[in-house]
Structures are given as structure tokens and as C-alpha cells.
Amino acid sequence: MAKKITAYIKLQVKAAQANPSPPVGPALGQHGVNIMEFCKAFNARTQGLEAGLPTPVIITVYSDRSFTFETKSTPASVLLKKAAGLTSGSARPNTVKVGTVTRAQLEEIAKTKNADLTAADMDAAVRTIAGSARSMGLNVEGV
């Protein structure tokens, strides 16, 4: 018989830097999950990623207080800010442009995000990422 699911927890945790402090500790503690066990497993799974990049994770908690988790790719906005060398996007993206990204940079981000995108092919994925860039106030070259 399958285990009964009691909760889904969605968090963004820095890759290879999970620790029991907020937001991880309180979110898992209220569901009775072993926090240190999650932190060790998460850090081991995200070891290959660049340390410090926020990584979305969906934790499934079962009735016996066990858990499984699935990591997603880093949000496109974080990757775009990194590619453009910015700390934040534009407060007024349609009037004030704060940086520029090239098609090559967009293709690299699309390859990273491809597993989480619903695009039919790489060109559609690049256009999706380009739309995210424009909504952040970035100029897009070559698309």
C-alpha cells in the first residue's frame, strides 16, 4: 500500500547551502520532518550546482513523517540577472532598460531551464526566456 501524503512544501533554498535556519527549519518542523536529514540529502543532491544559486524544491511529506523531494532548475530571473551582471531588474521595465542580454546567453539559460520549460523546441525555449528578460527591463539582442 502506498504511503499517505500529508503535505507538499515548496521552498527556494540556496544550492548546497541548506541549513536548519529559516525558511527551511520552520517549514519542515511544523510537518514533523527530520530537518537535518533533509539538509544533508539536499546538499548532497545539489553539490554539482553552483553554490548559492536559489534552487526551488518541492518536498512531499508522508504520514509516517518520511519525505521525498524534487529539485527544479534555478529561476530564469536569477540566471538572467547573473548573465546581465545585475542585482535587480528594472522597476519600470517598459520605459527604463537596465541591461542587455545576447541570444547566446539566452540559449545557455534555455539549455539550463529546458527540463522545466514546456517549450516544443530550443527556439521556443529561447523566446520564452527572452520574454522573461524583456519583462525584467533587459534589452534582448538577436531574437
Curated annotation (Swiss-Prot):
GO-annotated biological processes: translation
Q: Which InterPro entries match?
A: Ribosomal_uL11 (IPR000911), Ribosomal_uL11_bac-typ (IPR006519), Ribosomal_uL11_C (IPR020783), Ribosomal_uL11_C_sf (IPR036769), Ribosomal_uL11_CS (IPR020785), Ribosomal_uL11_N (IPR020784), Ribosomal_uL11_N_sf (IPR036796)
The molecular function GO annotations come to: large ribosomal subunit rRNA binding; structural constituent of ribosome
What does the entry's PTM section describe?
One or more lysine residues are methylated.
PROSITE patterns per UniProt: RIBOSOMAL_L11
- CDD domains in the record: Ribosomal_L11
Q: Which SMART domains match?
A: RL11
Identify one Pfam family in the record. Ribosomal_L11
One CC-aspect GO term: cytosolic large ribosomal subunit
What's in the keyword line of the UniProt record? Methylation, Ribonucleoprotein, Ribosomal protein, RNA-binding, rRNA-binding
Query: What is the purpose of this protein?
Result: Forms part of the ribosomal stalk which helps the ribosome interact with GTP-bound translation factors.
The UniProt subunit note reads as follows:
Part of the ribosomal stalk of the 50S ribosomal subunit. Interacts with L10 and the large rRNA to form the base of the stalk. L10 forms an elongated spine to which L12 dimers bind in a sequential fashion forming a multimeric L10(L12)X complex.
Q: Which PANTHER family match?
A: 60S RIBOSOMAL PROTEIN L12, LARGE RIBOSOMAL SUBUNIT PROTEIN UL11M
Q: Which family does it belong to?
A: Belongs to the universal ribosomal protein uL11 family.
This protein is called Large ribosomal subunit protein uL11
> Upper lineage ranks?
Bacteria, Pseudomonadati, Pseudomonadota, Gammaproteobacteria, Pseudomonadales
